[in-house]
Each structure stands twice: as C-alpha cells, then as structure tokens.
Design a protein with these regions (language model features):
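Conserved beta-strand hairpin/beta-sheet module of binuclear metal-dependent hydrolase folds
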Residues: 1-47, 120-130
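Active-site HxH/HxHxD metal-binding segment of metal-dependent hydrolases
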Residues: 26-27, 34-107
Length: 218
C-alpha cells in the first residue's frame, strides 16, 4: 500500500494524503489548496483526516483549509512566519510536527525564497517541500532571493539520499523542455523527459524520487 496518496487539484497542483503506519485509514492532508477534491478522495478511499500540514501561505496550497475545518476539527500545522487562517501549530526550523494518530514525526526546515516563511516537513523517509523543489527545477522567487533559494536547496540536498520527495506541482515536463531549449544535446534531460512523459501517460505523478536525484537533476 502506498503510504502517500496524491490528489490532483486545479490545473497542476498536488495535495498529498499521508497514511498512518498502523492506521492506514487515517491520513494527514498536505497543502490542501481546495477542499472538494480532498473530500471526494476521503469518501472514495474511506479515510479519516487527523491533521493538516501547510508549507506556505499561497492560496493554491491553503485555500481549502477553512472548508475542511468546517467538516473536521483538525490541528493545522504551518509556517510561523506567515499568516494562514486556521493554523493552530505555527512551526519554524528545528520544531517537530508530531501526528500521534499516524505514528509520524516530522522535522521542520525553514526554506525561504518562494515565500518568505516557506517551510518543509521531513522525516519517516519523506520530504514535503511545497513549491521550493520540483523535479528538474525549483520554485519562483516571489518573496525571496536567488541566494536564499540556493541555501534552501542546499538544506534539502543534505537530507538522506533515499528520501522520497513530494512536490507541490506537476512541472517536470515544462522544466525539462525549457532545459532542452537551452541545452538541446543534454542526453540526461532527454532521457528524463521521456520517462516523465511515460509516467504521465500512465497517470502517475512525477512526485517521489531520491532527494539526491531531485537536487542533482534540478
């Protein structure tokens, strides 16, 4: 059983549902940009939410929080340096996001650049990095600098090599086409694009890979 379910939202967002180790019918919801697809997934898979984890304040990642709270009285974890309605547990670097119902314990990293207070959750072999790191790319600099992005990516690159990376958007094909426009003879990019296209044709999200692979590709 996959420990993480993906819920497509909007045009290219991913909302993640993390299953409990000992209670796979319970889940934590990561970056619910809208509530409707989450509620549908919960019904379809007969899942019970126990927490919400937010990486940053952009509406396409938190727009569904308030509606979900109308259905479920959940703890909401989020960045301490950003205002997100509904957050009950503000977090910054070296804090822990502990979800006892799922037997999960996540560390928190401050990874500013895309937004000023962006955080990531890591642990249990997983990384939820919001809009900082993508397959073959990184997030746009809306509130930070290139130097901050480099520092944030360096933090992510230092995580264990076998960390599964869960990003906030389905961007790899566009990122790789851009890379090939700049370096048309880049065989690694060509091979990666072919793989990504095969994944998408099979309905698979391009979301989880080794942290070392993601950061080196990006």
């Amino acid at each position: 059983m996959d420990p993480v379910l993906h819920v497509p939202a909007f045009q290219d967002n991913y909302i993640w549902l993390i299953r409990g180790r000992r209670a796979p019918h319970k889940v934590a919801i990561v970056d619910p940009g809208e509530a409707a697809p989450v509620l549908a997934a919960l019904r379809t898979h007969k899942l019970t939410p126990v927490a919400i984890l937010c990486t940053h304040h952009h509406d396409d990642h938190v727009g569904g929080v308030e509606e979900l709270l109308e259905h479920f009285p959940l703890p909401v974890y989020g960045p301490a340096r950003e205002h997100i309605d509904g957050v009950s547990h503000p977090l910054s670097e070296d804090a822990r996001a502990v979800v006892p119902e799922l037997d999960l314990d996540f560390g928190v990293l401050d990874i500013p650049a895309h937004t000023a207070g962006h955080i990531a959750y890591h642990g249990n072999g997983m990384l939820f990095c919001g809009d900082t790191l993508f397959s073959a790319g990184c997030g746009r600099l809306f509130e930070g600098s290139a130097a901050q992005m480099a520092q944030s990516l360096a933090k992510l690159a230092a995580l264990p090599d076998d960390t599964a990376v869960y990003c906030g958007h389905e961007y790899p094909a566009a990122n790789l086409r851009f890379a090939l426009a700049v370096e048309p003879d880049n065989r690694a990019a060509q091979a990666h694009l072919t793989q990504v296209q095969a994944w998408r044709a099979a309905g698979r999200p391009c979301r989880a890979a080794a942290a070392s692979s993601f950061t080196s590709d990006s």
